[in-house]
Regions:
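Glycine-rich phosphate-binding loops of nucleotide-dependent enzymes
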Residues: 2-263
Length: 263
């Protein structure tokens, strides 16, 4: 049996005595997409911060390739190959594409104290990596990031993460602020990252998008894992109902039906 690339076992997190996460266990394999589903307040953001090294779990363990790890900082998580791309890509609108791609790891030319940022190398690599993900409209590494569409900014951030060796790619609501065509392109990019052997964790409340790309699904409700299933084991309606609270949603539907009948 293949060892999961990333495994969480019994992870809980408390803040001042309040449980934000309770006993979360998850696995994600290389070349697979785990969709982490949940409504606002479900605990998704806290779980992202634990996996990316911003928070330490109160209890529980994290393993990379079967080996226990203890993240003291986001740098520790990054060194283990975990990259997180947030909703707006973490990009810089007033930078060129090449400069933004290499922030903190700039290629240089020259010698000793006379080293300078190698804009051409940076731009060429950034354009090449973006085009490998299907962003063919970007041909100039000097183009300002602010001129890119939302989907292109997401592609830039994803391409950067993969280029710098991400084995686990956490995407936090990557399609939330995008139109239909832009969202579709981001979903295609997710599948391309999957094909490269990257383990993708797609954090979303959009069930339709999750079902298009996901291999494995977990639903969080109020900090607990409410369900864990594979592709094809649940219908979209079942997942939506679970996320909405099941009985609570049924009660609301009955109440609205009664109001319509009384109108």
């Amino acid at each position: 049996m293949t060892t999961p690339l990333l495994r969480l076992t019994g992870v809980s997190k408390s803040f001042l005595g309040t449980n934000a996460l309770q006993d979360i266990s998850l696995e994600v394999d290389a070349g697979k997409v785990l969709c982490l589903l949940g409504d606002n307040g479900a605990g998704k953001s806290t779980l992202i911060k634990i996996m990316s090294g911003f928070h330490k779990p109160t209890t529980g363990t994290i393993e990379i390739n079967g080996e226990p790890v203890d993240f003291e900082s986001p740098r520790d998580a990054s060194d283990q190959g975990i990259a997180t791309v947030h909703q707006f890509g973490g990009t810089f609108p007033l930078m060129g594409v090449g400069r933004c791609f290499f922030v903190g790891a700039e290629p240089t030319k020259g010698w000793g104290p006379f080293k300078l940022f190698d804009k051409k190398v940076a731009g060429d690599i950034a354009v090449r990596e973006m085009q490998s993900l299907g962003i063919t409209r970007v041909t100039d590494g000097d183009r300002l990031v602010g001129s890119l569409s939302g989907g292109e900014r997401q592609a830039l951030a994803i391409a950067r993460a993969v280029y710098f060796g991400a084995n686990v790619l956490i995407l936090d609501e990557p399609t939330a602020a995008l139109g239909v065509k832009e969202a579709a392109h981001v979903l295609r990019i997710i599948m391309q990252a999957r094909a490269k052997g990257v383990a993708v964790i797609l954090v979303t409340h959009n069930v339709r998008h999750a079902m298009m790309v996901g291999d494995h699904f977990a639903v969080l409700i109020r900090g607990q894992k409410a369900d864990d299933f594979r592709k094809g084991e649940r219908t979209r309606e079942e997942i939506t109902d679970l996320m909405a609270g099941g009985e609570a949603m049924a009660d609301l539907e009955a109440e609205l039906a009664q109001l319509q009948a009384d109108a």
